[in-house]
Amino acid sequence: MAELFTSQQLGPHEVGDPSPLAAAVLTDGNRVLVAVIAVVALAALVLAGVLVRQVLAAGEGTDGMKKIAAAVQEGAKAYLARQLRTLGVFAVVVFFLLMLLPADDWNQRAGRSIFFLIGAAFSAATGYIGMWLAVRSNVRVAAAAREATPAPGEPEKDLTLVSHKATKIAFRTGGVVGMFTVGLGLLGACCVVLVYAADAPKVLEGFGLGAALIAMFMRVGGGIFTKAADVGADLVGKVEQGIPEDDPRNAATIADNVGDNVGDCAGMAADLFESYAVTLVAALILGKVAFGDSGLAFPLLVPAIGVLTAMIGIFAVAPRRSDRSGMSAINRGFFVSAVISLVLVAVAVFVYLPGSYADLDGVTDAAIAGKSGDPRILALVAVAIGIVLAALIQQLTGYFTETTRRPVKDIGKTSLTGPATVVLAGISLGLESAVYTALLIGLGVYGAFLLGGTSIMLALFAVALAGTGLLTTVGVIVAMDTFGPVSDNAQGIAEMSGDVEGAGAQVLTDLDAVGNTTKAITKGIAIATAVLAAAALFGSYRDAITTGAADVGEKLSGAGAPMNLMMDISQPNNLVGLIAGAAAVFLFSGLAINAVSRSAGAVVFEVRRQFRERPGIMDHTEKPEYGKVVDICTRDALRELATPGLLAVMAPIFIGFTLGVGALGAFLAGAIGAGTLMAVFLANSGGSWDNAKKLVEDGHHGGKGSEAHAATVIGDTVGDPFKDTAGPAINPLLKVMNLVALLIAPAVIKFSYGADKSIGVRVLIAVVAFVVIAVAVYVSKRRGIAMGDEDDTGARPEPADPAAVS
């Protein structure tokens, strides 16, 4: 990373010197290629429609199962509708703010704002469609499992075939979400390139920002909703009342199942969609500089191949009798997709790209045009790094989170000595695993970076290509992730209805265990995708400040270069920016976890109140008021959205206009470094606690109802906001901050140097940004105090009578 800050070897493009080389254009041949890629994207959407019909054709089970599924559908729909209305207002405000930022012309400025709305709409649509199908397929998975234990008079089914059918329904549901993710992401990027040609990278900044902002809000909001309900349900239900998970007597059960869909399904779908969009943004910006004309089409060709191989991978998940578990079939689909992607990319590279850098048309950097070597080798190896990185992270994350591996078994053993040792063991595992994962991602980034040799822009483009390589697996990755909440919900519906017992219940338990593993694995790969996208955007940011400095007659390095423009970590302002970037990640994580804590507290008091005031709930003579808990989670999730979102947008603005673009670059580097470690730590520690609980529930160390079980439940409740709220939300946070920095960089330079220099404007903007952050954090902290005040006045229910909960 030091080279990014101190590089002295700058080509003509990088220092703004005039170059006789022609600028990149979208040739007729490339226009046809991009149009074909757009057709591939549309084919993905068509396949999604076919898979929807297949999933919905399955049976829905008993009336009791249908009734519970309808309640989950209603809650999820109501929450997302309210969330999207709130975000719609925010998106309109940002649309007009983007119009104020500098651009080459009004056409580019309008396009950036319009495609911001399109990116936001696509991101929201991906999440909404994923949720819509997930809440309909869960009951179908439960109904399929029920065939293993048919009612009197119904024919018996082969247990293996029943398990395979349930697995296929759940995974095909994920396949729909995966196809929408890659289809809409690729279609949006192709439309921008076809309409704006060589100006497409600038317009795509708006598309990427729209996708990233909505994804971050859906991640944070969905995470708060799902984990508030989950923590509240576990603390009162399992720990205090000693009733099973998803017991219909627990008032938080429906909210918990709703949360699985709005958090794990809608949130992750939007998250990976924006990773897809943002990686393409960075790859096209850098590709235009590094590969000229070819750089406007090749970054789209790689994920287009990924769309085709994702189709193969989804259908390759066809369970066999020889499979040890559903995970074997899912792994087979993933690796089949990855291997075919690598082979097809190799073919595409050698067919599409020329054999020398001199033959790349439209490259304005003389250092790249004159470089020896074969650009096809660089492109192939960079993409291969991304694909291999996805496979390695899948294995590494699985090692730290699967119930059959030693780390989770060790945490299970610590449950014999109480919850404190469970929590300590999980934190230790998370910290250790973060190091290995971060080193693996770092090696991937550095390996791609080395491919560029002495050209910084070529090296950064290689990093972006590694990101597109990782994107080739996204279709299957999204399918794997959606499999988790669908199987979890299916087990919940079966438990609440009481209509699935014996072998059928065991089928669902096994599917849920596989789902926990797939969720943990996809979180690891999502983090890698986010880091590669952020690193590539960092390169795009460097290109933006290079161009901006040239426009005002300044240079980035060497004698006479302004301190605020130099990306040199030895400069005090840059060091402050680096520390601030790392601090922003910690503040964001703290705000998200605290929001879950507050909301979960409200859920706990509500569930306790219902048990106390409606004693008939325990003997099934009274029904809990499920809707009250859903309302609490919805209200708190939407209320808590603002502070983390404002921090992500305003922090780069404050640093940039206060300390300059050099410090802003350091801020991004600090955020990427700290964010990588924090996201992996939170995801893996949370995942390990969850599966340690599953391990005990399967009969180890005393099984359900034992003290060891209570200890692992406490560990799981601590890990819930780690792995499902704060950890995943760091992914879009990094990209939002990078995109905001990329968009404001020209304005920071404009008001710092040249004819438009204005210290007053810089100070005003910086003060406004700081005040917005300070007020948002203050209001957020005040909410916690207000909760305590309400307790003092008696508005909050008194703790339950020990006799009632023993």
Question: Over which residues does each language-model region extend?
Answer:
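Hydrophobic packing and interface segments
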Residues: 2-806
